[in-house]
Swiss-Prot record:
This is Alkanesulfonate monooxygenase. InterPro entries: Alkanesulphonate_mOase_FMN-dep, Luciferase-like_dom, Luciferase-like_sf, SsuD_RutA_monooxygenase. It is an enzyme of class 1 (oxidoreductase). It comes from the Bacteria. PANTHER family: ALKANESULFONATE MONOOXYGENASE, ALKANESULFONATE MONOOXYGENASE-RELATED. Belongs to the SsuD family. It catalyses: an alkanesulfonate + FMNH2 + O2 = an aldehyde + FMN + sulfite + H2O + 2 H(+). Its EC number is 1.14.14.5.
Length: 385
């Protein structure tokens, strides 16, 4: 089981929908979260993309020297940048990080934002552009440096003599990750993608998506891995966890929720539509927002994209993760508020249950975790409870 964390380049806070308890989205904080994820034993981090956050490539590049083993899941944007430029960026990053790059293919589901960036295309056309883009991008990274270049004549994008002089460390190219819930998205996944990502829907819905993509990929002679994107609120007791879930949305008012839901409703993203359907745009009771045992839809009231959280004590969180893993999920991309503190909580409380230990760094005999020395003489004992 692989566990990733998240770099909150769109800001961080103790509460949703208010400036109260907010933290500056600056390099010092991004570095703190990245170093914590690296030293705690997370396998990688996701960096978000879009106008609501700092540029993922610039931030990820700045974090390479601050980390040792952490992988970076960074977005390429078909239709917003050329496949040639994106291929060179990916190869350089992979070389400078010694093979620590993972690629998140983001077609985009907010037509207003995309038009603001200069892309005027409907939903299915955007996925057709993505298909052309990935044919060229993969060819450039996999083979163009070994021959005279690649040619591709697509419906929307073409290349003639495309060549990449500096190959990536990971061959044939850094692994491709991708999420999308529409039939057009599933077709892209089956044709091109190494790991398909689902947002945190109930297990039955995730299982259905996995089955469809597996069947499509098998028909093309391919196998695909699967991951899931979730928030997490883990505490020593379930009562504490649910209390903090309620606290996270305690500053939300009806107007803030309504404005967020109106913005989401204008998108043509099938995944966003499915997220919104889980809570109906209304702030309800815990029972109404707990859409499956320990799966809470409160985050999606005002946050776009991943809108559900696993909430509970360590054993409950681990049980839900194993339930998803039984469906074929290999990678969990998690986040929590505030991201620095929650990264420690999850690693300390849940890693021993799902990864076989807490801090997975190679360390000397006196490296922790062991807590503060007792009486200036003794290392503290392990819990007897």
């Amino acid at each position: 089981m692989n566990v990733f964390w998240f770099i909150p380049t769109h800001g961080d806070s103790r509460y949703l929908g208010t400036a109260e308890g907010a933290r500056a989205a600056d390099y010092d904080y991004f570095r703190q979260v990245a170093v914590a994820a690296d030293t705690l034993g997370y396998d990688g981090v996701l960096l978000p993309t879009g106008r609501s956050c700092e540029d993922a490539w610039v931030v990820a590049s700045s974090l390479i020297p601050a980390t040792k083993r952490l992988k970076f899941l960074v977005a390429i944007r078909p239709g917003l940048s050329s496949p040639g430029l994106s291929a060179r960026m990916a190869s350089t990053f992979d070389r400078l990080s010694d093979g620590r790059l993972l690629i998140n293919v983001v077609t985009g589901g907010d037509s207003a934002e995309l038009e603001g960036d200069g892309l005027f295309a409907d939903h299915d056309t955007r996925y057709a552009i993505t298909d052309d883009f990935l044919h060229i991008w993969r060819g450039l990274l996999a083979e163009s440096h070994e021959n005279g270049g690649i040619d591709f004549d697509g419906e929307h994008l073409s290349a003639k003599g495309g060549k990449l002089l500096y190959p990536p460390v990971q061959r044939p190219h850094p692994p491709l990750w991708f999420g999308g819930s529409s039939p057009a998205a599933h077709a892209i996944a089956a044709d091109h993608i190494d790991t398909y990502l689902s947002w945190g829907e109930p297990p039955a819905a995730v299982e259905k998506k996995i089955a469809d993509i597996r069947a499509r990929a098998a028909a093309r002679g391919r196998e695909i891995k699967f991951g899931i994107r979730l928030h997490v609120i883990v505490r020593e007791t379930q009562e504490e966890a649910w209390r903090d879930a309620d606290r996270l949305i305690s500053r939300l008012d009806d107007d803030t929720i309504a404005r967020a839901q109106q913005a989401f409703a204008k998108m043509d993203s099938e995944g966003q539509r499915r997220m919104a359907a889980l809570h109906g745009g209304k702030r309800g009771s815990r029972q109404e927002l707990e859409i499956y045992p320990n799966l809470w839809a409160g985050v999606g009231l005002v946050r776009g994209g991943a809108g559900t959280a696993l909430v509970g004590n360590p054993e409950q969180i681990a049980a839900r993760m194993r339930e998803y893993a039984a469906l074929g999920i290999e990678t969990f991309i998690l986040s929590g508020y505030p991201h620095l503190e929650e990264s420690y909580r999850f690693a300390e409380l849940v890693f021993p249950l799902v990864k076989g230990g807490g801090n997975t760094r190679r360390a000397g005999p006196l490296s922790g975790p062991f807590g503060e020395v007792v009486g200036n003489q003794y290392l503290p004992k392990a819990s007897q409870s």
